Amino acid sequence: MTGLIQNRDAFLDNIAKELGRARKTEGVERPVWKSNVNIETLKDYSQEELLEVFKNQCTNIHTTVVETTNERLREDLQQVIMENGGGPILLSADERFDAYGLTSLFKEELPKRDVEVNVWDPERKDGNMRLAEKANIGIAFSDYTLAESGTIVVQSHKGQGRSLHFLPTVYLAIIPRETLVPRITQAVQDMNSRVEDGETAASCINFITGPSNSADIEMNLVVGVHGPLKAIYFIV
């Protein structure tokens, strides 16, 4: 359904009047950018160079980075989970857990160690929020990873909602290396291309830069007020 724009002409006429001129209704062209810093920044960096930028930025945002491989990911995840108090754990319902060989870790190995593991259920909205609220650890995959700011981008879908990323005490993000891009520009360009190709845009897109950081008027840093106390990134 196409939306309706109400009172547009009156609004634009008033702006033109305040500018002291007649309203322009034709011959208007989008101005050429004087600077392309949004595109030029880090554009010639290799994946390894972007990774170094990303890791350096993570030290500034109080985020631990674990470099791992497909073969070591299960072991590294289990170690970090146990070091951070175990469960309850809340996972996104994401096929990538199976693709990365993690299904048995969460279905068998961790439960044998008395670690409670739950998976986001698309049929239980309120139930999911309660699980997220009580979760010690939330785990999800990054859809885009921004080197410049140390940011992961996660898109809401039926298998994960916003609360999965913000309510658990500890947040673990699994980052496939191919998701690493220089900055927000490239991530948004790709999202836009997908929408133009017919994909439906996510109802909520979250840009997460480390754990929750807040500062009061005296610039005293407080961690965990609006989200997780700790964030750990696994680069695979």
UniProtKB/Swiss-Prot annotation:
> What are the disulfide bonds?
none
Lineage: superkingdom: Bacteria
- Signal sequence region: none
**What GO terms describe the biological role, i.e. biological process, of this protein?**
lactate metabolic process
Under InterPro entries, the record lists: FTHF_cligase-like_sf (IPR024185), LUD_dom (IPR003741), LutC (IPR022823), NagB/RpiA_transferase-like (IPR037171)
Q: Which Pfam families match?
A: LUD_dom (PF02589)
Task of the protein: Is involved in L-lactate degradation and allows cells to grow with lactate as the sole carbon source.
PANTHER family tied to this protein: LACTATE UTILIZATION PROTEIN C
Family stated for the protein in its record: Belongs to the LutC/YkgG family.
Protein known as: Lactate utilization protein C
- From what organism does this protein derive? Bacillus cereus (strain G9842)
